[in-house]
Amino acid sequence: MINQHPKRSDEPVFWGLFGAGGMWCAIIAPVIIMLVGILLPLGIGPEGAFSYERVLAFAQSWVGRLFLFLMIVLPLWCGLHRIHHGMHDLKIHVPAGKWVFYGLAAILTVVTLIGVVTL
């Protein structure tokens, strides 16, 4: 017999954050790593485009704060989701694993939010 009142799962929320983090890591993060980690140190790029004053002004704007927040939080959720399910696949069962990994991601999200807002 089919259960008429199935328990609602919270997994779609975590899969959504995992998927968004995975897409961010695949599309946005490599561009930023190449720009900040390779091109800028080599001096390739417009003169003064990434001066301290311009980067600080960007980081303190609402678009910059949103970008920094997403650049930190989305890969964080993706990574902790992968670790949680990877440990499950390896049959390493952490007591209250969902609370440990997703709770850590939530705490670090709040810490990141506080850090970005007070920038």
UniProtKB/Swiss-Prot annotation:
- What's a Gene Ontology MF term here? succinate dehydrogenase activity
Output the GO biological process annotations, alphabetical, semicolon-separated: fumarate metabolic process
CC per GO annotation? fumarate reductase complex; plasma membrane
Keyword entries, A-Z: Cell inner membrane, Cell membrane, Membrane, Transmembrane, Transmembrane helix
Protein's membrane topology: Multi-pass membrane protein
Indicate where this protein resides in the cell: Cell inner membrane
Entry annotated with the keyword Cell membrane: yes
**InterPro entries per UniProt:** Fumarate_red_D, SQR/QFR_C/D
Spell out the subunit comment: Part of an enzyme complex containing four subunits: a flavoprotein (FrdA), an iron-sulfur protein (FrdB), and two hydrophobic anchor proteins (FrdC and FrdD).
Which function does this protein serve?
A: Two distinct, membrane-bound, FAD-containing enzymes are responsible for the catalysis of fumarate and succinate interconversion; fumarate reductase is used in anaerobic growth, and succinate dehydrogenase is used in aerobic growth. Anchors the catalytic components of the fumarate reductase complex to the cell inner membrane, binds quinones.
| Family membership noted in the UniProt record | Belongs to the FrdD family.
Q: What is this protein called?
A: Fumarate reductase subunit D
Print the organism lineage: Bacteria, Pseudomonadati, Pseudomonadota, Gammaproteobacteria, Enterobacterales
